[in-house]
Amino acid sequence: MSARDRIFLETTRRFAPPRLAEDDVRIALGLAQVDPGKPVADLGCGYGRHLRALVEQGHTHPLGIDRSALLIAEAQAHAPGARLIRGDLRSLPLHAGSLAAAFCFYSSMFLGAEHDALVALRECARTLRPGGALVLTTDNPVRLAARPRSRFEEEVPGLGRVVEESTFDARQVVDRVTKTVQTPAGEKLSATFVIRYYLPPSLAALARAAGLVFRRLEPDAPLTESTPQLIALLEKVQDDG
């Protein structure tokens, strides 16, 4: 069990309210236009908060994929009905054309180098049916660039003192986030997350290289500093004819 996985699990489930996941899924389903019963997947599902929302919103057996054994185990308990597979987004353990839609919430696909992101998008394109949707939800890089440095500190009951420090490189469009937890027992956990972001033109180019088409943002308007998230609809290229 890595410190990285433990920190992600303990901080996210305390600071991310269920309503946020419910809203994320509602918007994503509205963009994907996929009927209940069709095969859908949460890529980088974590401990299953979005899977649970998918189940609650009519998709009773969504597929969740994550490479963390800890998070997959948590997702099994958190999202009854979901099917869970431990796997890497760069090599999805799925047949070609097996998904009607896929969702990736909060940058799970963009935690590595740019080449990793391209490989992951190509894998997603491979597993989507022609015309199938991929909805990406990330933080808004325009908003991050307006405040490139931030620090958060809070004493969290049952967890300890949590410190989060973030530095955003606007030139590279990369955010470096270090989270540290000091537990009541005196244990200190720390991990750094390097998250790559894409402005819409760059995301469209990356999608095109992967065999996907960038369709639109939600809302369908240019990003500004006040836009909370980047939510993008990509689509698998339709077969000719």
Short names for language-model regions:
Residues 93-102:
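A short acidic, Gly/Pro-enriched loop at the edge of an enzyme's catalytic core
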Residues 135-204:
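SAM-dependent methyltransferase
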